[in-house]
Amino acid sequence: MEDFTPWQLKMFQKTLKKKLRLKALKKHLRNLSSSDCCLLITCGDNNGAINFFLNELGGKWSWADFEDKSIQEMSEFLGKEVHQVSEDNLPFPDNEFEYVISVDVHEHLEDPNPFTRELWRVAKPGGKVIVTVPNGDETKIATRIKNSIGMTKEKYGHVREGYDIPELKEVLKANNIEPCAESSFSQFFTEMLELTINFLYVNILSKKSKAKVEKGTIAPATQDQLKSVEKTYRMYSLVYPMFWLISKLDCIFFNSVGHAVMVEGKKG
């Protein structure tokens, strides 16, 4: 029987870190109601799969992304417009959303404040702003390994490694968003597996791709990019169960802050 599952969802099922991010977001959205207006903003490393799964939780969702490379495919997949946005101009009214979620945007910005002020502006009074970024702690072993093999922040399209939880809280507080919850995910083993995948794509596969691959792209983001690495992706699909099992060793670091952090704040 032919499988009609969208390629975005098939690809998501073979991810590690993206699944952990969705799991963490679900915990922060546990009080979401069907009438809540919600906004998700991403920054290029998104094919729409996480949007799909968040939409399944309920609420009335709007979508936005900073880059245009996959917006058309995302809009077609989701059946709803994905807005292209800039850091100081979100095309939404003031006080519009009960939940505003930013996924891995701040580390791309020289100055995080204009964008964070926009998150504050479009959130309703008392609404929640949830921000996730890479952990900016450069002393973490996995981060040191990344930098030592040339997978620096620039390869990911970042202007900084990220933010640790106290730094991210300060950014939110500076823009009148009061932090009220925090979490983290992705420990050493998941990071090393992700690094292996990203290193292979950035340094080898993307250079052979027939589809255009923009600087800062660490994994296929469009169907054409995925088709260009189809044979390698099939091989990865075969070893994915082993990767998944290895990633479970992250439990060894249950007391450590993960390599991705999330802070939830409330608009006063």
What are these regions (language model features)?
Residues 99-110:
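A short SAM/SAH-binding and catalytic strip from SAM-dependent methyltransferases
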Residues 91-93, 110, 164:
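GHKL-family ATP-binding catalytic core of two-component histidine kinases
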Residues 1-93, 99-101, 242-245, 254-262:
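Conserved N-terminal segment of class I S-adenosyl-L-methionine
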Residues 23, 72, 98, 113-117, ...:
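Surface-exposed alpha-helical interface segments used for non-catalytic interactions
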Residues 3, 8-16, 113-114, 118, ...:
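S-adenosyl-L-methionine-dependent methyltransferase catalytic module, highlighting the catalytic core
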Residues 109-110, 123-125:
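Helix-to-beta-strand junctions that scaffold the AdoMet/dcAdoMet cofactor pocket
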Residues 265-268:
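C-terminal beta-strand of the catalytic ATP-binding
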